[in-house]
């Protein structure tokens, strides 16, 4: 999908890999080596300590009063989760990457994401995500990057699977 002129960019639906790694020195290097050996290129990556996700769950439990587990269980999970990181990967060949990582005994999950290539100038991401708000589509998380002198930036956005078709149609109407 080519975005309208003022949004200056394109969007495509891709597949993201999520991998749980032990949070220890050298583990990310091992993951990268596994992918390199299969000639799989990492295009974008986000790393988050799993403890943050568990903290969010615990905080939501406190706010809503909905108790899925006992407080002691959450504290135990929180303690254990600091030993792990959640790695989100955009790669050039996701199906092959998934097989390769599973073969190397990694826990892997796949899910659809939206990848935006935008002109690297102030306000471009804001113009695009404004369309999500107008379409009443919540963005769960974003990661991306560009260097100051790069012509393009890349951003990975995750939305609920139920919202993918709606936002694709909304953006397609803009081209």
PLM regions: where:
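A conserved regulatory-domain signal marking ACT and ACT-like small-molecule sensing domains
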Residues: 3, 7-175
């Amino acid at each position: 999908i080519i975005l309208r002129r003022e949004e200056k960019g394109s969007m495509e639906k891709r597949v993201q890999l999520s991998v749980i790694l032990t949070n220890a020195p050298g583990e990310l290097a091992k993951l990268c080596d596994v992918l390199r050996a299969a000639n799989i290129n990492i295009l974008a990556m986000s790393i988050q300590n799993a403890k943050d996700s568990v903290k969010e769950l615990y905080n939501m439990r406190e706010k809503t009063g909905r108790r899925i587990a006992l407080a002691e269980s959450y504290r135990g999970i929180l303690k254990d989760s600091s030993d792990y990181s959640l790695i989100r990967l955009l790669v050039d060949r996701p199906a092959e990457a998934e097989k390769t990582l599973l073969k190397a005994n990694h826990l892997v999950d796949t899910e659809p994401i939206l990848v935006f290539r935008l002109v690297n100038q102030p306000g471009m991401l804001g113009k695009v995500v404004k369309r999500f708000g107008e379409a009443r589509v919540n963005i769960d998380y974003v990661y991306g990057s560009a260097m100051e002198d790069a012509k393009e930036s890349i951003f990975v956005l995750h939305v609920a699977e139920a919202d993918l078709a709606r936002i694709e149609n909304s953006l397609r109407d803009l081209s």
